[in-house]
Amino acid sequence: LESFGNHPSFCMFSLGNELWGSQKELNSILKTYKELDNRHLYTQGSNNFQWFPAQLENDDFFVGVRLAGDRLIRGSYAMCDAPQGHIQTAAPSTMKDYDSAIHPNRAAHSSEASEDGTVQIQFGTTMKTVKASEANADFIPTVPIVTHEIGQYETFPNFEEIEKYTGSIKARNFEVFKERLDEAGLLPLDKAFFESSGKLAAACYKEELEAVFRSRTLAGFQLLDLQDFSGQGTALVGMLDAFMEPKGIITPEEYRHFNDRAVLLARFEKYVYADNEPFKAHIELAYFDKSNIDGRVCTVTVKDSDSTKIFSESYGINYSGENYLDIANIILNCSQIMAQRYD
């Protein structure tokens, strides 16, 4: 705080990542820091106490992945951090948001500590036993909520990246992966594996981020990650490589369709329809830009695989400064559409 408190990008301060220990001591540290410099927003940490989240008196915002055992606020989880999220367990859809998890209409399932007051927690990539009290299933933070480390969708290695390591750091991990693939007789398929896994990862990131932008009571998100992380056993979780350069999976323009100051969204129940079913969609806009869009027009167009227009309507936007706008409901008769080919 004394060295970097004036830095223009220093606006939020977290005590650490996935901490355990004394809530009283953490709160005391926050109090001391806020008395020293109250210009920033402070929080006890990111995803502290994991299955047993709590809001401290001096928290200005809350960061976590769940609010109780089954009140999940991100799309996917590791097996050691179960239950898993909707992207892993539910049929593909664009209906999911986290508003009902943040403000539930029922008592959620609460994880329970064992008789000796301990619980198994995620610790790195393994498990660890710690002291814990029973989680509060009705926990609803009264401060803004930020969802923690969303994403983490991995791609297959791109072995062409090995050539980029021209300095003291070498891509030994990629070299090992390539050698193993060659030994298995699968090296000729490496590009197909990379491209296919990349398309799946991009689709998962799209749903992960759109679910966040559909959530009107969620204040923000921490993404893991924009770029690959080459340490700790390798995490190829970025749409960019470790050099912050595109992998060729998705363009910046395509990425901004679902992660930008303005994100246009369509809620519909599924991706596959029979010809006797109606296609229904609710069109909405998550908007965090400063420009006044009152009176602007939103045109909704549906095209087939040959780019022939099947549906097109324009809707006026009524805007008075809000971040979430409901624009229109559309209904489309699928019997009018020939079966489409998906490449």
Set out the residue ranges of the language-model regions.
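Active-site neighborhood of glycoside hydrolase catalytic domains
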Residues: 1-56
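Substrate-binding clefts and catalytic carboxylate motifs of secreted carbohydrate-active enzymes
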Residues: 75-312
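Buried hydrophobic-core signal for structured, non-transmembrane domains
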Residues: 279-285, 329-332, 343
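Intrinsically disordered, low-complexity Pro/Gly/Ser/Thr-rich segments with frequent PxxP/GP/PP motifs
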Residues: 296, 308-339
